[in-house]
Amino acid sequence: MNPIVKSFEYGQHTVTLETGVIARQADAAVLASMGDTTVLVTVVGKKEAEAGRDFFPLTVNYQEKTYAAGKIPGGFFKREGRPSEEETLIARLIDRPIRPLFPNGFKNEVQVIITVVSVDPEIEPDIISMIGTSAALAISGIPFNGPLGAARVGYINGEYVLNPTVKQIGASQLNLVVAGTESAVLMVESEAQALPEEVMLGSVVYGHDQQQVVIKAIAEFKAEAGKPTWDWTAPVEDEALVAQIKELAEAGFIEAYQIQVKQERYAQVAVVKAAAKEALLAANPDVDLREVDNLLGSLEKKVVRGRILRGMPRIDGREPDMVRALSVLAGVLPRTHGSALFTRGETQALVTCTLGTERDAQKIDSIMGERTNRFMLHYNFPPYSVGETGMVGSPKRREIGHGKLAWRGINAVMPSAEEFPYSVRVVSEITESNGSSSMASVCGTSLALMDAGVPIKTSVAGIAMGLVKEGDDFVVLSDILGDEDHLGDMDFKVAGTRDGVTALQMDIKIEGITKEIMEIALQQAYGARVHILNVMDQAIGSHRADISDHAPRITTIKINPEKIRDVIGKGGAVIRALTEETGTTIELEDDGTVKIASSNGEATKEAIRRIEEITSEVEVGRIYNGKVIRIVDFGAFVNILPGKDGLVHISQISDERVANVSDHLELNQEVTVKVMEVDRQGRVRLSIKEAQTKEPAAE
């Protein structure tokens, strides 16, 4: 074994890259560490591409092992199962910036596996995973236009912080991840507390500048440990076939893209492609139809991009900065706690909000520790939304990613647990889609939350921006269609309020995206966002004054913390009886806070009355209605409050002499008693004869 190690300082931490010891049969394997957080990254690529393949089969698998945090997995099998939501999101985070760095035409299968083998609870594993992946690809010999750098940027007390710790992120107004090459930013993912556009742009530039140390270190690591580059050359286009296809299809594509309705346009594009293929097959029956499909796609892309760059109207007839027609409806479903239907052009989201108690919150046990998530947002993209058939089942990677982006956009305006003691689940059903469905989910979520009476700080809207760039010419597009996303050079999603940005996601397919272009995109996005917010506020401008009649109402009371055990009872018997008999949900906290949830106001009042009974102190001199629970020779024990019994001595039963207690009292008999004394040991002395006056009894 011949280990090769490269170490360098990066922000507050030391980063170490090591190869040559572990997983030596992979094309490349790097053990990457940042502090005590360590990941093993392996890369394997197939030397030959499958014949006729027309896509690049890159797979990124990110897996967190519980042993990394010194834990044993839960569940019956006691081993790791399918990827968690967090693992899926980090896999996407790694995939997005590396995918565009593989050369065009490269169709060989590549698999990247990142395994977290040690974790420091203060250092998240995502950044070192991205760095380790970049290093492994750099030394693998697989064609890759890297290296790639990655950085997390925080914003604390008006200053940017490089790779903040978990504790620092908690105090930060920004949590942004940026990845890029030496000359270009490729990917941004962020969550922010409504920060101004200039702060967001500054954080991207700061992160890209700081990660140059990573890019330089990986280049040096590659020089020392890199394998020979594969002998691979990009396939050469058949220029004669390209010319034939242009002659057969260009005019048809130009005409088809005059059609503004998506389904009609798609039908006409299909006609143009079918006619071109038919003509080519007639001339040459041996023509490669897969190559023809690829070349038709390239021509289609050039036609659309050329129209935009020449200043012609967009596919649906809009100008570059125009937002599609909006339709906003709140309260569209009668029995949900909150609902909204948000439509922007041919993109539509039906969004619902459900309120629950604290026990409905999501409990997450990851290698970074346990946490509770009171706000959940789930995004569903059924096949009918794009007029197709398909599998319906558990959420795919894309649905998880889009849901998390919408969650980030909204989270900054959510109320605290003290302001609003409910768990909140939002579901966005995409019922129509033609671009920017995740941002439609942000808008719909804001509306549904307000309809449910959730006191969010202000409305939030989201917009997707696009870019078409050739040389020095570029056009920034607002509210992009699905086709513009597919054919363009950038997908730039911005969510925020009137005051600032709450989430920013950017994926760039080309180099040369300058600070100027990002600045224009952010400013154009701000104008579009304000326009959408104005329309949304006309439908519902602030949260409803009260929650839905169908939602559980949570009432909070305080009791003496020492009385919590009395409310719970032996083996939970008391609280179980309380919840079953009143039909409420009751939650207790260590500080004596009691939360009673029910959609029935009378049930809540009854639960409060009984809890107050259980926790109230016995008062000397007060009269109570009680029940005889035990008879002894010297008197009777009477229950006066839940869990509170007292003794009526034989001498205190009547003014007359009592020879036998059973002659005057029987079990379960209701009697009125007066508290005469509570001694130091908490024993209660009662009297029936002293309570014979007309004083009202305590229930």
From Swiss-Prot:
Cell compartment(s), UniProt: Cytoplasm
Record-listed E.C. numbers: 2.7.7.8
Main location: cytoplasm
GO biological process: mRNA catabolic process; RNA catabolic process; RNA processing
Pfam assignment, any one: RNase_PH
An MF annotation (GO) of this entry: magnesium ion binding
PROSITE patterns membership: KH_TYPE_1, S1
Chain positions recorded as Mg(2+) binding sites: 485, 491
InterPro entries: ExoRNase_PH_dom1, ExoRNase_PH_dom2, ExoRNase_PH_dom2_sf, KH_dom, KH_dom_type_1, KH_dom_type_1_sf, NA-bd_OB-fold, PNPase
Summary of subunit composition and partner proteins: Component of the RNA degradosome, which is a multiprotein complex involved in RNA processing and mRNA degradation.
Function: Involved in mRNA degradation. Catalyzes the phosphorolysis of single-stranded polyribonucleotides processively in the 3'- to 5'-direction.
Family in the record: Belongs to the polyribonucleotide nucleotidyltransferase family.
Protein name: Polyribonucleotide nucleotidyltransferase
Source species of the chain: Shewanella oneidensis (strain ATCC 700550 / JCM 31522 / CIP 106686 / LMG 19005 / NCIMB 14063 / MR-1)
Encoding gene, per UniProt annotation: pnp
